[in-house]
Curated annotation (Swiss-Prot):
Keyword Iron listed: no
Listed GO biological process terms: translation
Gene Ontology molecular-function annotations: small ribosomal subunit rRNA binding; structural constituent of ribosome
Transmembrane regions: none
Native source organism of the sequence: Methylobacterium sp. (strain 4-46)
Keyword Ribonucleoprotein: yes
Keywords annotated in UniProt: Ribonucleoprotein, Ribosomal protein, RNA-binding, rRNA-binding
Family statement: Belongs to the bacterial ribosomal protein bS6 family.
Entry's Gene Ontology cellular component terms: cytosolic small ribosomal subunit
Phylogenetic classification of the source organism: Bacteria, Pseudomonadati, Pseudomonadota, Alphaproteobacteria, Hyphomicrobiales
Record protein name field: Small ribosomal subunit protein bS6
Length: 134
């Protein structure tokens, strides 16, 4: 079977739970066609460089997939039909990475720096001073 990295962007107005249910549905498609999803990473809501289907932000998600091409084609077909998916990209790779992706490493690094500086970061990326009172 072939190895793939698949990233998809879901509309900003869907909830994180809905994104998780989409991930589970797409995992089911892959597994029912003889493949498996090795790793899933939700990168959160990020700003887009330009508007896509009238959206300025999107939920970014990465899937590392080990599946036959037919399974991937079926998953992509279902993503094309879904109105909640803005874009997706699938790349065939020689080997899947076991460690966190660069996006997750960046998030961890940013959170660590904010803790050291006494700041907090919310889901939208806003950085504000930590409130010590409560």
């Amino acid at each position: 079977m072939a190895l793939y990295e698949h990233v998809f962007l879901a509309r900003q107005d869907v909830t994180s739970q809905q994104v998780e249910s989409m991930i589970e549905a797409y995992k089911g498609v892959i597994e029912s066609n003889g493949g498996k999803v090795e790793k899933t990473e939700m990168w959160g809501v990020k700003s887009l460089a330009y508007r896509i289907k009238k959206n300025r932000k999107a939920h970014f998600t990465l899937l590392n997939i080990d599946a036959p091409p037919a399974a991937l084609a079926e998953m992509e077909r279902q993503m094309r039909i879904s109105e909640d998916i803005l874009r997706f990209l699938t790349i065939r790779v020689d080997a899947l990475e076991g460690e966190p992706s660069a996006m997750m490493q960046k998030r961890d690094r940013d959170e660590r720096k904010d803790r050291e500086r006494g700041r907090r970061r919310d889901d939208d990326g806003y950085v504000g001073e930590r409130n010590e009172e409560g």
